[in-house]
């Protein structure tokens, strides 16, 4: 419980603290010789010309080694692992801070002009949040790409009593992001395409179309609930609000009458239900969500966007710039070199192009399908996973 309160993290083997514990146990000689414990982005910054090893506030706060509320490395956690704080990169709280300049050697290798400022960015998902204009309390950013996540900006460092959510500093904005992740998200849809849709890929190539457009047309012929088919989207274990590395992807409910359209719709719905788990966990913890902005490949599908609006019961806003992460990183640099006064001014660059409004007529059908999704998971978790 203290871990969840101080470090605002779920217990997860992917985090830095778990990897450091493994390294200390299994490679003691390398551990003894280590002069600095650094993340890869800190190392790259130094190689490009930063004058020291630096890490940004959002990246530092996600690894279970930082006291997030006090905005510093946790001496307690470092003492547990036997790491002197002098062996850590310096935490930078100022958005886009200039930490060095491109020198001659790096310029020759990279093509970047000598003297180009090197600015601190942020964790990739925080760059995405910033690029989506999420700087104020109540704005959520849903990333539906290879990896899925839902970030909600909050003025309060809220703790989830069930310890399903992560709290991080919202770099440069003076507040926090409350978040959770899906290990697959749109990767499950890509898996379905590559495993079951050779014909659609061939037809798309001949017609000069995207295979996903053909699959989406099929999905539109299947009703809400996919004619009773449920797909658990846990092809790399369950993330999000369930945190179960042993969970697996599953189709349940197929009959001789099941069509590919039903299976495809079940996959799309299953991905949405896993993300809905996260949104429900965030709202159950007292976090308000006023609007959801969508980034990632799923934003290209009107069918999928409307499905999310109906399942989440929130409007879904589509960003003008689909590469929100790249935009966010550029905006941090803009703040750092003085092109913008602060993050709030920089965030005004963001624009939304379309909004999908929830259709209340579809709530009951999706709620029933979501309940079945939860029931299938619970049954398999007890006996199979």
Residue ranges and their predicted role:
Residues 1-10, 14-54, 64-84, 98-100, ...:
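Active-site core segments that coordinate phosphate-bearing ligands/cofactors
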Residues 56-59:
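N-terminal low-complexity or amphipathic/hydrophobic leaders
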Residues 82-94:
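A conserved helix-loop-beta module that forms one wall/lid of the active-site cleft
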């Amino acid at each position: 419980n203290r871990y969840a309160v101080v470090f605002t993290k779920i217990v997860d083997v992917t985090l830095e603290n778990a990897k450091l514990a493994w390294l200390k146990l299994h490679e003691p000689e390398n551990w003894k010789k280590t002069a600095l414990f650094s993340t890869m982005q800190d190392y790259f910054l130094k190689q490009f010309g930063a004058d020291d090893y630096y890490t940004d506030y959002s990246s530092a706060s996600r690894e279970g080694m930082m006291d997030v509320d006090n905005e510093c490395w946790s001496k307690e956690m470092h003492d547990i692992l036997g790491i002197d704080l002098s062996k850590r990169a310096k935490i930078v709280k100022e958005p886009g801070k200039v930490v060095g300049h491109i020198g001659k050697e790096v310029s020759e290798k990279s093509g970047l002009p000598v003297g180009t400022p090197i600015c601190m960015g942020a964790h990739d998902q925080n760059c995405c949040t910033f690029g989506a204009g999420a700087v104020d309390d109540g704005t959520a950013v849903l990333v539906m790409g290879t990896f899925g996540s839902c970030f909600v900006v909050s003025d309060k460092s809220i703790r989830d009593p069930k310890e399903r959510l992560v709290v991080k500093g919202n770099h440069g904005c003076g507040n926090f992001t409350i978040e959770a992740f899906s290990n697959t998200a749109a990767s499950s849809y890509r898996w379905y395409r590559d495993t079951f849709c050779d014909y659609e890929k061939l037809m798309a190539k001949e017609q000069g179309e995207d295979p996903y457009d053909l699959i989406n047309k099929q999905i539109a012929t299947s009703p809400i609930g996919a004619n009773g088919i449920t797909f658990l989207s846990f092809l790399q274990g369950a993330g999000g609000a369930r945190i179960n590395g042993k969970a697996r992807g599953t189709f349940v409910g197929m009959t001789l009458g099941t069509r590919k359209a039903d299976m495809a719709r079940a996959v799309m719905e299953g991905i949405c239900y896993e993300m809905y788990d996260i949104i429900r966990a965030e709202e159950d913890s007292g976090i308000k969500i006023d609007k959801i902005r969508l980034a990632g490949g799923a934003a290209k599908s009107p069918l999928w966007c409307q499905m999310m609006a109906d399942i989440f019961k929130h409007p879904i806003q589509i960003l003008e710039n689909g590469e929100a992460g790249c935009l966010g990183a550029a905006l941090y640099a803009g703040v750092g070199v003085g092109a913008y006064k602060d993050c709030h001014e920089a965030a005004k660059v963001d624009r939304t192009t379309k909004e999908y409004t929830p259709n209340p007529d579809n709530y009951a059908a999706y709620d029933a399908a979501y309940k079945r999704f939860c029931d299938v998971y619970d049954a398999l978790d007890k006996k199979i996973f």
